[in-house]
Amino acid sequence: MKTLFLLGLIALSAVSVYCEEEEKTEKKETKYGTIIGIDLGTTYSCVGVYKNGRVEIIANDQGNRITPSYVAFSGDQGDRLIGDAAKNQLTINPENTIFDAKRLIGRDYNDKTVQADIKHWPFKVIDKSNKPSVEVKVGSDNKQFTPEEVSAMVLVKMKEIAESYLGKEVKNAVVTVPAYFNDAQRQATKDAGTIAGLNVVRIINEPTAAAIAYGLDKKDGERNILVFDLGGGTFDVSMLTIDNGVFEVLATNGDTHLGGEDFDQRVMEYFIKLYKKKSGKDLRKDKRAVQKLRREVEKAKRALSTQHQTKVEIESLFDGEDFSETLTRAKFEELNMDLFRATLKPVQKVLEDSDLKKDDVHEIVLVGGSTRIPKVQQLIKEFFNGKEPSRGINPDEAVAYGAAVQGGVISGEEDTGEIVLLDVNPLTMGIETVGGVMTKLIGRNTVIPTKKSQVFSTAADNQPTVTIQVFEGERPMTKDNHQLGKFDLTGLPPAPRGVPQIEVTFEIDVNGILHVTAEDKGTGNKNKITITNDQNRLSPEDIERMINDAEKFAEDDKKVKDKAEARNELESYAYNLKNQIEDKEKLGGKLDEDDKKTIEEAVEEAISWLGSNAEASAEELKEQKKDLESKVQPIVSKLYKDAGAGGEEAPEEGSDDKDEL
């Protein structure tokens, strides 16, 4: 196994070089001109540009630096409104005002979170081939829009805001996504950019962008930064090291369906129940009333960040009746405490994955409007034993700021040459080997782009074909992970089991696309597959479920893996002996007939036992191997003693073992 270990070291040391070269190559080869940075948020979006050595966050036509991610169609002509204008008319036109497109993008219609959200939205969501689309009235016609199209409309607005400020057309953008977005969601976001007439030169992770905003001017050596990003609809935690312009992500975790919208919803449900209890009337029957309540609840939530209680007052809310209730900060916290506490689990996971202790974290950077909630700040401070989070950056603008810097890096703006961004892949990737074992090639939280190779062999004599099955996930057995693809390497020349050397190479490019190559080292015969962003990629819920399952079933997994490994060890040992006895150049030519027969019978007995004991436990398999060793080792020891220990070494366990395909 020494060769494989060295190979791992070479692959790992190549990672950083590969990443930096990617950046440099991109700069040299393509002239993009101005590249804007866009934070495409669930509830609000923001745009910035890097010029003349600094970032400018650009205000919209209302003078606001953040723009609601809302689209509406109003009036007899179906006029399209985007941003503030769309949000401002929500209560009079709820059925034709679309928001939260980010909670639909890249997801299936039957996704649990989509089905839960549909119950709360005033607009109609329909099923088109298991993909959600929004149906609204445009003038006198019913029209359907995909989440990509709705997001594209918001991106068009952000593009126009930038063009108005710059006084020229903008064609290129860096767009941010939650770190825990899967490939389908990332690809859908890129597609939205294309629909908006933008070339999305890079998709980057929101917490990474925020770290750039925080660390751009920090020149005080290596620092460990935890970015806690709680926005309107998504939640991410990333651990990074920042060292003089090099931003390296160590680990990332999160929940793509947790944010301010969920906190608002809890308060709305509380008031709807309260109103029904007092008046006997159900607010949900009137979409306008619900949206009026939504608007006022959001205002109340914001007010409670700076005061301990606030009044929620709505004139003529339902059936001409006014609504007036007090909401205290304590009640708001009580309604949402489980959601607030749920943010700490990913923080703990990121610390574990980074192999860092709480005391190793130099700075905690809070990003996203929901981090203004005092209880959220308090929980983080308590978790880190009283450490105060940094307040140096604007939580609403930090992500767009970092995206604008990355745009400057790619377009070759001055003063950005020292900035290098090293991000990670969120899940482990590997292949299936004998016994259904998941053999990992690239671990989760590995810096991308990256490349890793490992040598495997065959599981049967004269095997003409091996099937390379590629999986993604954290469980030890492939049946519990997600299959990304498979392909065959054919035309292997006849050879005993364990002799062919098949090198499998995994390469993840800067866009997170996986390329897998298998090569027979003996013949040079090659085959490869590219795993692209198809609809079969995992949803963030799947990712979270896998990691949670892995924790829950760790004990069961260990038993199954131990059993598979014990079986592989016994099989390899038995077949290795069999091959050596049949080889006149090895043991076969050195043993007398009696000893040879003893070993042959012991080996055949072990192989036969394996065949008839498919469900044997790890302990039974280990016992069987010990039994075989007890019969073989005295004979082999005697042979080498007689030869004065001058010959070749006895066949040791693992001497020539490779994982078998």
UniProtKB/Swiss-Prot annotation:
AMPylated by fic-1. A motif (Prevents secretion from ER) lies at residues 658-661. It holds the Pfam family HSP70. The keyword Ion transport does not apply. GO terms for molecular function: ATP binding; ATP hydrolysis activity; ATP-dependent protein folding chaperone; heat shock protein binding; protein folding chaperone. CDD domains: ASKHA_NBD_HSP70_BiP. Its main location: endoplasmic reticulum. GO terms for biological process: chaperone cofactor-dependent protein refolding; endoplasmic reticulum unfolded protein response; ERAD pathway; IRE1-mediated unfolded protein response; protein refolding. Residues 649-661 have a biased composition (Acidic residues). Residues 639-661 are annotated as: Disordered. InterPro entries: ATPase_NBD, BIP_NBD, Heat_shock_70_CS, HSP70_C_sf, HSP70_peptide-bd_sf, Hsp_70_fam. It comes from the Eukaryota. It is found in: Endoplasmic reticulum lumen. GO terms for cellular component: cytoplasm; endoplasmic reticulum chaperone complex; endoplasmic reticulum lumen; membrane; nucleus. Residues 1-17 form the signal peptide. Probably plays a role in facilitating the assembly of multimeric protein complexes inside the ER. This is Heat shock 70 kDa protein C. It comes from Caenorhabditis elegans.
